[in-house]
Structure formats: structure tokens, C-alpha cells
Amino acid sequence: LHLSLRRQRQMCIRDRLEVDLIPQGTLAERCRAGGAGIPAFYTPAGYGTEISEGKEVRIYKGKPHILETALTADFSFVKAWKGDTAGNLIYKGTARNFNPLMAMAGKITVAEVEELVEAGKLDPNQIHTPGIFVQRIVQGVNYEKRIEQLTVRKKTHDVK
């Protein structure tokens, strides 16, 4: 959630939307812990900020750490570049950051893939999410490559 979006800000102000501020690394670790069955962990990230308010604090090696609980989901929806009919998934680029963690953290994971192949056709060394974590797989259609065009000034005439 990006809080600079006007609609989300208004929902927060009117108490219609609850927001938890979580450092990105902590969010990733909470998802990973949930998928691995680890109920909670300690981290120094966020100590001394509003993020740590109301959380258990312990000192490790002289440094304060706050207790963070694992995150799980009833359903996880992930998007992969390629997958096979057994649910094995390969991601491209930054999709590798959170998708594998969310696939593990969901009780039921639904994966959308750009390309679907038969089981056994993927190189096992390239698989990022094993099929054991995927319960449903669908092949998407009509993908659009969105590329932003950098504009530094208005075009006044054609350059030859």
C-alpha cells in the first residue's frame, strides 16, 4: 500500500483502513517464517520507532530486538513467468523477491503463468517455487509490456 495515494489516505483518516508499517525485509521474513512454520522471530529492524510500539523487546549481544510474528494466508496469488502442470514455477526479475515466499505462506496458492509446459519440461535448477506449494495453476493471456517513456521536455519539432 502506498500511502501517498489520495483514496488510501482518506480511508486511513476515516478509520476505514488499518495500516501496519513494516520494513520490507521484515515483511519478507514474516512471510518466509509463515511458510516454514516458524511462529515468530526477533529482529532489530524498527526498534525505537512506532513499529516497535507494544511489541516484546529482548536484548541480544547488547542490541535490542523486537518480536515479529509470522504471516500466513488462506490464499496466495502469485504471478510467474513459466510453470509446469505440476505447479513448479520460474519467476523473472523482481518477481523472485516475494512470490516464492508468498507461495509458501499460503494454505492455497494460485499461480498465474505466462507460459505453461508439461511436467518435467523445466530445468530443475531453474525452479524457484516447487510444485508442492502450488495448488492451482492457470495460464494467463494478453500480456502487455508496460514501459514508461521518459519525457524531459515537450517535443517541439522532429529531429532528423
Language-model region placement:
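ATP/pyrophosphate-binding catalytic subdomain of soluble kinases
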Residues: 15-93
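Conserved catalytic block of serine-dependent lipid acyl chemistry
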Residues: 71, 89-91, 96, 104-107, ...
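Short gly/pro/ser/thr-enriched loop/turn and capping motifs at secondary-structure boundaries
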Residues: 7, 26-29, 117-119
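Single conserved hydrophobic/aromatic residue that forms the stacking wall/gate
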Residues: 1-13
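Alpha-helical scaffold segments in soluble metabolic enzymes
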Residues: 8, 30-33, 75, 79, ...
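ATP/nucleoside-binding phosphotransfer catalytic cores, i.e., glycine-rich phosphate-binding loops
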Residues: 83, 101-160
